[in-house]
Amino acid sequence: MQIDNLKNSKAIETLLPKYRANINDYVITLGGDKLLFTVELEGTSFTSVSDEELKTYFSSLDDFFLNLGKEYGGKLAIWTHIVKKRDELEQKYKFHSKFIQNFTDKYLSGFTNQNFFKTSYFITFVLKYNDLNDGLASCDSILAQANTLLNRYDGKLLSILDITDSVSICENNEFLSYLLNGTYQTITLNDSEVLDSVCNSDLFFNYDYFEIRNKESTISKYGTAYFLKSYPARTTLGMWDFLLELPYEFILSQSFIFTTAQKSIRAIEIQENKLSSSGDSATYQLEELEEARAYLSSGEIAFGDYQASILIFGETAKAAVDNGAKVISAFTDKGRGARWSRAAIESIYAFLSIMPDSKFRPLSSVRGSTSLVCGFSLHNYFSGKALGNPIGDGSAIMPLKTPTQGLYYLNTHYTPLKVNALGEFIAGHFLMLGATGTGKTTLEATIVAFLQRFNPQLFVMDYKRSTELYMRAYGATYFTFESGVDTGLNPFQLEEVASQDLLQFLYSWVISCSRDHNGLISDEDRMLIKEAVDAVMKLDIEERRFSMLLQVIPRSTPLYIRLRKWSHFEGGELAWIVDSPKNLFNPYDFDKIGFDTTTFLETQGHEGTEPLFSVLLYYKDLMKKSGRLLLSIVEEFYIPCSYPTTEQMIKRTLKTGRLTGEFLGLVSQSPADAIRSNIFEPIVEQTSTKIMLPNPDAEYKGSYERIGLSRKDFYLLKGLDKESRKFLVKQSGSSTLAHFDLSHCKEFLPIISGSTLGQQECEKIRSIYGDDPDIWIPLFLERMEEIKKEKAALKQNSQQNL
C-alpha cells in the first residue's frame, strides 16, 4: 500500500445529501422536501438489567419502529449508528494539599497513554414531506414517541445550544461532521448551509483503505470499509454486543427505509425470485421471506430497505487494515453468521452510505424492522457521569478504569446523565461493603482525597484506626477513645444558655443510659430525667456534668440505681464515657475530625456504644457550616444502627442530609452483619450509590438481594477474587465493574493504606515535629521506606543463612 496510489475525492461534497439549514432548534432541512433530526442514546447497562427486562426493552424498541413504519410508511427513513471512539481523561484536578496533589497526580498518570474507548448510539430520522409545517409537526410527533427511548437509554436530542447571548453551537451539525471527518469539531450556528459547515476534510480512497485529511489538523485518520453481505440466518437481541469489548474505533451504520406494505410484498417477491434462480442453498432465507410475507399481511412487522456498512479506523493505514480484519474476524466468530465484504474499490460508497439520507447504499436488501433492532441493541457499559454533577464544580469525584478498556466516572450523588444538576440538593449517600483485605480502606481514602478539591468538612467514626493516617494527612484532627480514660465529651457544657435543640438531645441522651434490662423506660422516669437535665442546665457551665443528674433524682428510685454506673461521683465503671468533668470538644470549631471508636465496636453489646455514638453524631450535626459540604463516614455502621437513639440519628441524616449538603458514607467489612442492620431497608433506599467490593462468601437470597443487586450484578461480584482490585458500583438501575489499581503509587500506600506499624511510626514523628502534614508526611514516608529496606535486608540475610 502506497500513499501515492490514493485517489483524491475532492468533490465528495457533490455526492453527499444536500444538508441545507437548521430550520429550528433540532431539525435540518434536506434538499427541498426532507427533514432530518438525530437523537443520541447512551444505552442500558445490560450487564445489570435482567434478561427478562432486556427482552421487554427489545420488544418496546421493535414496537417503536413498527409503529413509525405503520404511520409514515415510505415517507420515513432511519439511519442508526453505533459509534465507538477513543476516550480521554480531560479533567484537571487541583488541590491545596501537597500530599494529595502528588498522590492524585501519580494516580492519574496511570490514565495517560492508555487506550480507552466509549460507545454511543445514534438514531437519525429522515422524513419526506409535502407541506413544511406538516413535516415539522410530524418531526415533533416522532420525537414525542421517542421520549420513552430517551428516558430509558439516557438519551438526548441533538439540538442548537446557546453558549452565550451571541453564540450557539449545533450538536446535530457536529454529529454529521463527525461522520464525515472522523473527529468532533465545534460548529456554531451561522448563515452557511449545513453541508458547507460539515465538509472540512479531504478524503482519499485506495483499494485497501481510505484517508481523512482534516483541514484543521496535520494528522490523518485512516480507515477501512466493509459492506454487510449476508445477514445472520437467525437473529437475536444483542447479537452484536461483542463489539462493545473490541478495542478499536469504528462506525457501524445501519439504515432502514420504510416501504408501504404493497411495495414490501413486491420486493419480497423479487428477492424470492433472485434466491430461487441463484442456485444457492438458501432454503432458510426463502422460508424467512415466506414467513415475513405472512407477518406483513397481518401488520405484525414493518418492512423496508435495509443496508449496513462499517468503517474501522486506525492511526496508520496498516493499523486500519489490521483493525478491520480483527473486527470482521470477531463477526465470524461471534456475529451469528453475519458476512461482511471489504468494500475495496467501492470504499467511497461504503463511506458515503453512513451519511443520513445517502443515496449510496450498496448491497441493500428487504428486511423487517426487527432485524434492525437485533443489530442495534442499545446495550452498553455504564460509564458514570463526568460533568454536571451536583457538588463542587460538577466534575465527577474521580476516574476509574473498567475491565473493558473504558473510563468510569465515580460519583456518590446520582443524577440523570444528560441533566446538568450542578448546585442541586441531591442525596449523595453511599454504601460500601467488602470483605477484609479487598482494599476497602484504600479505595475510601482515595475517594476522600479526590473530594478534598471541593474543601468539604469531614467527620469520621473509625474502626481500628484504619482512617487515621489519611485523615491526618488531609489536615484532620484525630482522637482515640481508650477504655477507662475520660472521653472528654460533656454536652452539658456546650451552651451557656441551652437551646431547645440541645435540651431535647440531652433528654434522649440520658434516656439512652437509663433503660432497664428490657430496653424500656417508664413515663415516670422520663419526667424525672427531664427535671434532672433542666436542673443541671441551670448550674454554672463549668459545674455541669452527668454526675450532677444524681443530685436531683431520688436515691430510692430504680432510675438512680441504673444511672450510678455512669457517674464518677458514684464510682461508676462506665463514668469515663459520659461523665467527663470538662468538655474538651467544641463542635462549632470542628472542620475535619475523626474518632477511633474501636473500644466500643469490638465489644459486642458494649453499654457505652449508644451514649457515645449519639454524642458524636450530635456534635457532627453542630459542626456543619452553612454553604460547606460535609462528608460523614461511619465505619461498621450496623453497630450504631442497632441502638434506638443512634439509629434514628443516622436515619434522619439519610433523609434530610441533602438539604444541608451532608452526604453519608456507611462502610463495613462485615457485609453479612451490615445487611442485618435494623434500618437496612431505609439505608438501601437512601444511598444512591452502592460500592460492593469482593466477598467470596456472599449469598444472594436474603442478603445481597436486599441491597438491590440483580442476579447478574451478584454473579459479577461473586466472581471477583479478593486480590482482583475490582469492585462493583451500582447506581439506580445501572452497574459497572471498576478496576482500582495503585500498584504505581506504592510510595503513598503507607498513608493511603495504613497499618499498625505506620500508626506507631506516625505518632513518634508527630510527637517531635508536630501535626503539620507538610512537615511530618515526608519524614514519615522516608521512615517507612527505611523500614521496608531493613525488612528486605533481613529477609535476604535469613535466606542466605539457610
What are these regions (language model features)?
Residues M432:
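Hydrophobic anchor at the beta1->P-loop junction of P-loop NTPases
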Residues L443:
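Hydrophobic positions on the alpha1 helix immediately C-terminal to the Walker A/P-loop
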Residues I679-M692:
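A short helix-turn-beta junction within AAA+ P-loop NTPase domains corresponding to the substrate/partner-engaging
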